[in-house]
Amino acid sequence: MSVRDYSGVQVISSRKHRSMSRLPTVLLLLASAAVLAAGGQEATEDPFADETDQCQISVSAETMKSLHGGSMQPDGTCDNLWESFLSQFHQVRENLTACQERAAAGPAPDPSSQFCQQLLDDAQRQMEQEHRQYAATLEEQLHAAQQETQQEQEMKKALQKQLDALTDSRNALYIDLLLANIAIGETKQALSYYNLMPASMPIDKLHEQIVRFVYRVTIYQDQRLLNLMRFVRDIPSVEERRSLYQLAQREVQKRPSQRDGYVAAVYALSVREDLPVYQANRQLYDDLVRQSETRLKEQVANGNFKQAAELAARQPQHFRQLQTSLATIELKHWRKFDRFVPYANALPQPAQRLEVLRVLLSQIGDREKKTSHKYLVKAARQFDICEQFIGRGKVDQAVKKQLEELRGKFATFAKGKNYQHYLSESRKSSG
């Protein structure tokens, strides 16, 4: 056993003592010894103080060896052991202090979690780098796509412009063909081009263009208007027909040559035949047909048969609706019988002439039954001309039958006087 005295503390090393071999116990003893040593050192500074009590701590050699990590030599001096032990003690103390500080700050990270964190950080950095690269690639692709899209849009605009130009050219061609077919009276073909007009084209603008074309050339305007009336009848839409009728009416009213002639009558009768339009707007018919019919009757009564004859020649169906009215002389014009009676043979068709003669003989019977002779003489002259006209052409049996009926009508006015009598009188008077 060895004994070392350090300022009143004796450390006794003995191989026989093995009971104190645990590190915590020894560390506690050493800490107490260090405190006591410090207190003893302060006491020795006073020269007059009594000698402090000495404290002996017995530490076995085995304990010292275990505390020293098993590296203590058997023959090591006590001083060396003590110095080494103190050094180890201070190191342990520092380590414990550091551990205490770390414990106070927070739990120490698990080495495995540190490793995982490093892997996570590396993966995050790699993902961020890949994201930046991917974003840069996408940016380039987006820029390229934008440029390509812009080029395609420019190409699309150019193509659309060309398409619009072609569409405009096509529509202009359709309009030209439509107007050309109206001009020559090909109403069915004109209607096919009319139906090809695009829905985007305002229909009122198209109608205005059609009516302007009709009146573009003065010498053709009458015939073109008649063709237009036939064309309008074939349009399916009632509203579109009414629109064209109204535009045409305005132009007819502006022109005395049409307003005072047979053209106005054709227009009015065309509207009258179009029952849906007529029922929707009777004024289109009534305002013009009365004026037109009155003017034609005045002209015929005064011996001006041109407009009535043109109506009979160009529009026989429409003329048929007015022929009885035109052949009827108003009482105020009866004194102009000599001017009126040639009207019968001014008409182009046999049936039209016979109708005038029928109405004429009927009026003579109603108005001049006692003084009918001079009127019948003049009527017989016109009947003879009509009979010769019919004889030069081919007529059906209905016309021949009507001719014979009118011939017999002359014999009903005076007893013993027939058609031949009045015809002979007419030849005598004409010399």
Curated annotation (Swiss-Prot):
<comment type="subunit">
    <text>Homodimer.</text>
</comment>
<feature type="glycosylation site" description="N-linked (GlcNAc...) asparagine">
    <location>
        <position position="95"/>
    </location>
</feature>
<keyword id="KW-0964">Secreted</keyword>
<protein>
    <recommendedName>
        <fullName>Saglin</fullName>
    </recommendedName>
</protein>
<keyword id="KW-0732">Signal</keyword>
<keyword id="KW-0325">Glycoprotein</keyword>
<keyword id="KW-0175">Coiled coil</keyword>
<feature type="signal peptide">
    <location>
        <begin position="1"/>
        <end position="39"/>
    </location>
</feature>
<feature type="coiled-coil region">
    <location>
        <begin position="120"/>
        <end position="169"/>
    </location>
</feature>
<dbReference type="GO" id="GO:0005576">
    <property type="term" value="C:extracellular region"/>
</dbReference>
<comment type="function">
    <text>(Microbial infection) Facilitates efficient midgut colonization by Plasmodium berghei parasites. Promotes successful transmission of Plasmodium berghei at low infection densities.</text>
</comment>
<comment type="function">
    <text>(Microbial infection) Facilitates efficient midgut colonization by Plasmodium falciparum.</text>
</comment>
